[in-house]
């Protein structure tokens, strides 16, 4: 059996299914809303897609509903170590629909292990040999009215007293593609107070379409409007504290709020690459980290 429900996974399963899938299982077990789905173990990559692996993927996908749209996301083994993170180096695909398309997206996730981006990154780390083993996480898509990422510390300085939230309309694809700049918020981790708001001009969003995510113009009255209300920021801050408490350290969290106003977490991983002793000029920018976390392709690409 090559697949397991995400809800059944725990941290100990990271060695077989990858950190992303194991983390989603941990979040579910802690009572935090996570879209349901299944994980494909890393060993499946060594088997032909035409045989039992495909049968397992199709059966697990069909158990989620009648051809539901899903996210197909790489979940490499050891991808978020203390020394380095592979976030954004391997491909993930959004709004994939149909068993054939899901299987193809899984193959594309595996193929990204040998892509130029991932290979170059491994070379910079001095580990250009055999790529890491990779599982795959498949989750029901959230029809996001707004989505974003948040860090339970300052992602540049490492300051543990604040929560950094970035948000944009719809799916996160416009941010990944550099088409819009997200709104930025800073919250006090202690009091929940909003310490800073920077509202950006968000003229584009990606929403569901018949064949995948569709790029749309944002109505004029929302272009320069804040994505998040105070109550939503409060909910995000409380959730961030819960997640950090569960995992025992600063977290980089991807989230979405659906069109009914319900908050879902899409992944959580340790914050890496922050050098507390260095100035901001020596660290990666917050936007670099946001783009890494959001990294995914539209369903059409799969």
Which sequence ranges carry the predicted segments?
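Single, functionally critical "micro-switch" positions that shape active/binding sites
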Residues: 36, 87, 153, 177, ...
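Beta-strand scaffold of nucleotide-dependent catalytic cores
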Residues: 73, 83-84, 94-95, 104-106, ...
């Amino acid at each position: 059996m090559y697949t397991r429900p995400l809800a059944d996974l725990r941290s100990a399963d990271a060695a077989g299914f990858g950190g992303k899938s194991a983390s989603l299982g941990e979040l579910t077990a802690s009572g935090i809303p996570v879209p349901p789905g299944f994980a494909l173990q890393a060993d499946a990559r060594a088997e032909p897609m035409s045989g039992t692996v495909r049968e397992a993927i199709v059966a697990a996908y069909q158990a989620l509903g009648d051809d539901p749209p899903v996210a197909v996301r790489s979940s490499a083994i050891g991808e978020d170590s203390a020394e380095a993170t592979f976030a954004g180096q391997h491909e993930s695909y959004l709004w994939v629909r149909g068993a054939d398309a899901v299987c193809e997206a899984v193959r594309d996730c595996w193929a990204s292990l040998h892509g130029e981006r991932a290979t170059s990154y491994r070379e910079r780390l001095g580990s250009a040999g055999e790529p890491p083993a990779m599982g795959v996480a498949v989750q029901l898509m959230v029809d996001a009215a707004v989505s974003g990422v948040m860090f339970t510390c300052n992602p540049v300085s490492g300051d543990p007293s604040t929560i950094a939230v970035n948000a944009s309309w719809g799916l996160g694809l416009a941010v990944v593609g550099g088409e819009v700049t997200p709104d930025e918020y800073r919250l006090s981790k202690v009091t929940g107070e909003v310490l800073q708001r920077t509202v950006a001009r968000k003229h584009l969003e990606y929403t569901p379409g018949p064949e995948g995510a569709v790029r749309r113009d944002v109505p004029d009255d929302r272009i320069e409007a804040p994505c998040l209300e105070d109550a939503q920021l409060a909910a995000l801050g409380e959730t961030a504290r819960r997640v950090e408490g569960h995992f025992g350290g600063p977290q980089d969290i991807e989230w979405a709020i659906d069109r009914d106003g319900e908050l879902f977490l899409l992944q959580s991983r340790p914050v890496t690459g922050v050098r507390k002793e260095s100035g901001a000029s020596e660290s990666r920018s917050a936007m670099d980290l946001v783009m890494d976390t959001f990294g995914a392709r539209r369903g059409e690409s799969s």
